[in-house]
């Protein structure tokens, strides 16, 4: 590691501030929670859900990206916190060369881009499962593998594209920061992430709307409804998860982009204070297993309650028919 210069006063104040320490503390809680909830969620996906094979494949890959990000984010943020607590008298040791940061930043971007692309990928998969009438297990498995492979390739390639032709000769305060000469490409990535965030939201709403129309159109076709039951349930759950993650991804992509594009117009101390909280990817990663677990549990309890109500109540023929119809409508 080469020490070209010492950290600036603004950088020292940032890393040693209680604002940053509290942000790191909150982030570590979210990271630990993500690890625990991810294990539970993956187990539930295979034991308590009726997700189709393609959905399960993409969801598992999404969990991999989320936890890759959380692991690398924990290393980088704790390293920064360590400097701000124990190395205040050695600020010449703070700065890191861009080459030394390459692996850390690249892995971090694999996690970020993987989560974003996986959201788009799983919505494409849900649209395909909803629209395609003969969505067999073999086709489902093939679709899941193709989409997951494409997302993996794009995730690995993202940071390589950002730093292409960059000599990596500068220094950075931490490995959160992309290489200096690649700042414009990093901003382009944030803009693409912002667009994809809105596309995912609109797609979620559109697929949910079509899902409801499909459910209504086949409500009296018992055989067809049974065949589509898994697709209807899976689609609704996935869309709810994607829509819930919209806010955190919007804050990250738009917030970081706005701050980076206006660095010359604001104080560096203000920039550091804001960027600490605008970076919300770790909370987006936490929301993924949390909401998925909630949706799986809520749907299972709702179905169980409906079945118990039907089997325990004394009803007229009309009431019994109406309750069965209502039970079929639950996704």
From Swiss-Prot:
One of its GO terms (biological process) is detection of chemical stimulus involved in sensory perception. InterPro entries: 7TM_GPCR_serpentine_rcpt_Sra, Nematode_rcpt-like_serp_alpha. It is a multi-pass membrane protein. GO terms for cellular component: membrane. The chain crosses the membrane at residues 22-42, 57-77, 104-124, 143-163, 189-209, 238-258, 274-294. It is found in: Membrane. Pfam families: 7TM_GPCR_Sra. One of its GO terms (molecular function) is G protein-coupled receptor activity. Its main location: membrane. Keywords: Membrane, Transmembrane, Transmembrane helix. Belongs to the nematode receptor-like protein sra family. This is Serpentine receptor class alpha-1. It comes from Caenorhabditis elegans. The gene is sra-1.
